[in-house]
């Protein structure tokens, strides 16, 4: 079965935060005019406390690279870039460079001064081009006018990991979740996409004994 059909059948959405349908993004880049196309893995991970990309790199880097290769092949892309958090680069460059040897993929170290905003897909495209690291006005969008104004696919580390699973028929609609801060069991966990926060906290033995409410997935719980 064609990879796009597999991705559609799996209902795969991006894991970078927007949950945009992966197949739609890939098809947009595929159908955009341009004699060159590019693929970027966004491994910026600038959100405080979030460590799922690092976990995937340490434990499933081969899968992530495989997902990028699948994207490169589908698009007939010129080059792929792993745009990586500088602290991760220092830990993982040797491992990743070994995995991407003799491929079209290049490891690109994010400037530590780029901060959180450096993870915006248009800002990272500017960075790779050697321009000022700031978001672009949109439209046009990166899918049609990205690196050097060519169609560019930007997906998160976890998205490429999932593409590899989908291709192998092993995708189970799960997601990596970071739990950290003032809790007994910090870590990165892998649970069903549809699990509620209460079930996740109980399953990881992190459910508070006090009354609380969750303000957002990236903020601490509030006591009352």
Per-region residue spans from a language model:
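Iron-sulfur-cluster electron-transfer modules
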Residues: 1-133
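Short loop-to-beta-strand transition segments
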Residues: 25, 78-80, 205-218
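A residue-level signal for beta-strand positions that form part of recognition/binding surfaces
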Residues: 36-38, 174-176, 211-212
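Short amphipathic, charge-patterned alpha-helical segments
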Residues: 65-71, 192-208
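Hydrophobic alpha-helical positions that pack around
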Residues: 89-193, 204-208
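Eukaryotic mixed-charge, acidic/polar low-complexity intrinsically disordered regions
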Residues: 221-224
């Amino acid at each position: 079965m064609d990879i796009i059909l597999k991705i559609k059948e799996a209902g795969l959405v991006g894991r970078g935060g927007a949950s945009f349908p992966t197949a739609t993004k890939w098809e947009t880049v595929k159908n955009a005019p341009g004699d060159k196309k590019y693929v970027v893995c966004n491994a910026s991970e600038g959100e405080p406390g979030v460590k799922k990309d690092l976990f995937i790199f340490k434990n499933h880097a081969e899968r992530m690279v495989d997902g990028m290769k699948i994207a490169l092949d589908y698009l007939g892309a010129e080059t792929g870039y792993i745009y990586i958090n500088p602290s991760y680069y220092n830990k993982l460059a040797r491992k990743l460079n070994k995995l991407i040897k003799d491929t079209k993929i290049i490891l690109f170290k994010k400037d530590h001064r780029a901060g959180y905003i450096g993870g915006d897909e248009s800002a990272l495209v500017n960075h790779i081009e050697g321009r000022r690291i700031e978001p672009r006005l949109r439209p046009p969008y990166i899918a049609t006018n990205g690196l050097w104004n060519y169609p560019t696919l930007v997906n998160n580390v976890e998205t490429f990991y999932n593409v590899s699973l989908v291709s192998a028929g092993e995708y189970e609609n799960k997601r990596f979740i970071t739990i950290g801060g003032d809790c007994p069991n910090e870590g990165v966990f892998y649970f069903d996409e549809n699990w509620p926060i209460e079930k996740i906290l109980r399953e990881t033995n992190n459910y508070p004994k006090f009354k609380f409410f969750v303000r957002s997935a990236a903020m601490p719980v509030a006591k009352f």
